[in-house]
């Protein structure tokens, strides 16, 4: 069973934080070669703080995926780290949350679930369920072109707000990730096609999905 749940930075155990930060280093530094700061084999930054909430996907006690949420009213990567990568960045007004540090650990997923699995789409769905549960207007995030393609293929009805250039002169995008019924239904349909999960049980958080 894959369980995805939300937990605040303040309530995370040191062991679980270390596990997440180590997996983030594996993804963002070792695999993607992003310009991130790493200490003692872990990747973390100033946005991992008391204003942060994480979604954690856990299988057999091990984290296999995660994403970080920060309410847009607090310091975040859109208004901080990435702001200079856009010309006159225009952030929509409203009760939004920013998402960042999205990852699915390939090795752990392969070992614990197998190669054909809906782990990524399930984490997308959990993001929608979280935003709906806490009554946010939607999710704002900045992504690379490969991540943009992945989101589009999932069926999520995303929209591009603005395009910028990263420090590597690669295209990046400020996106609005909506929490509408159509988007949620599209993701649920993808998951039910690959698992024995029932549609109604996928509309909650914590999110439980029967996986091998």
UniProtKB/Swiss-Prot annotation:
Provide a GO biological process annotation. Answer: signal transduction
Q: Which domain of life does the protein's organism represent?
A: Bacteria
Instruction: Give the reactions, separated by semicolons, that this protein catalyses.
Output: a fatty acyl-[ACP] + S-adenosyl-L-methionine = an N-acyl-L-homoserine lactone + S-methyl-5'-thioadenosine + holo-[ACP] + H(+)
EC class of this enzyme?
transferase
Identify the keywords attached in UniProt to this record, alphabetized: Autoinducer synthesis, Quorum sensing, S-adenosyl-L-methionine, Transferase
Q: Gene3D superfamilies attached here?
A: 3.40.630.30
Q: Which residues form a coiled coil?
A: none
Q: Name one GO molecular function term.
A: N-acyl homoserine lactone synthase activity
**Keyword Phosphoprotein belongs to the record:** no
Query: Its Enzyme Commission number?
Result: 2.3.1.184
Residues of the signal sequence? Answer: none
Family stated for the protein in its record:
Belongs to the autoinducer synthase family.
Q: What does this protein do?
A: Required for the synthesis of OHHL (N-(3-oxohexanoyl)-L-homoserine lactone), an autoinducer molecule which binds to the EchR transcriptional regulator.
Q: What is this protein called?
A: Acyl-homoserine-lactone synthase
Q: Which organism is it from?
A: Dickeya chrysanthemi (Pectobacterium chrysanthemi)
Organism ancestry: Bacteria, Pseudomonadati, Pseudomonadota, Gammaproteobacteria, Enterobacterales
Give the encoding gene's name. echI
């Amino acid at each position: 069973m894959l369980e995805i749940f939300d937990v605040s930075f303040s309530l995370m155990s040191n062991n679980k934080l270390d596990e997440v930060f180590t997996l983030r280093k594996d993804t963002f530094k070792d695999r993607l070669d992003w310009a991130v700061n790493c200490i003692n084999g872990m990747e973390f930054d100033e946005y991992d703080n008391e204003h942060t909430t994480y979604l954690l996907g856990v299988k057999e006690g091990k984290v296999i995926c995660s994403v970080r949420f920060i309410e847009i009213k607090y310091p975040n990567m859109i208004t901080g780290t990435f702001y200079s990568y856009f010309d006159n960045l225009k952030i929509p007004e409203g009760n939004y949350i920013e998402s960042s540090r999205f990852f699915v650990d390939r090795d752990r997923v392969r070992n614990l679930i197998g190669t054909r699995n809906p782990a990524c789409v399930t984490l997308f769905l959990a993001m929608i369920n979280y935003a709906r549960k806490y009554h946010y207007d939607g999710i704002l995030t900045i992504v690379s072109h490969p991540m943009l393609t992945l989101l589009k293929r999932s069926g999520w009805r995303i929209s591009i707000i603005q395009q910028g250039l990263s420090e590597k002169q690669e295209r990046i995008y400020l996106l609005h990730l909506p929490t509408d019924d159509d988007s949620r239904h599209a993701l649920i349909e993808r998951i039910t096609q690959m698992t024995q999960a029932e549609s109604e049980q996928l509309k909650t958080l914590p999110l439980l999905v029967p996986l091998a």
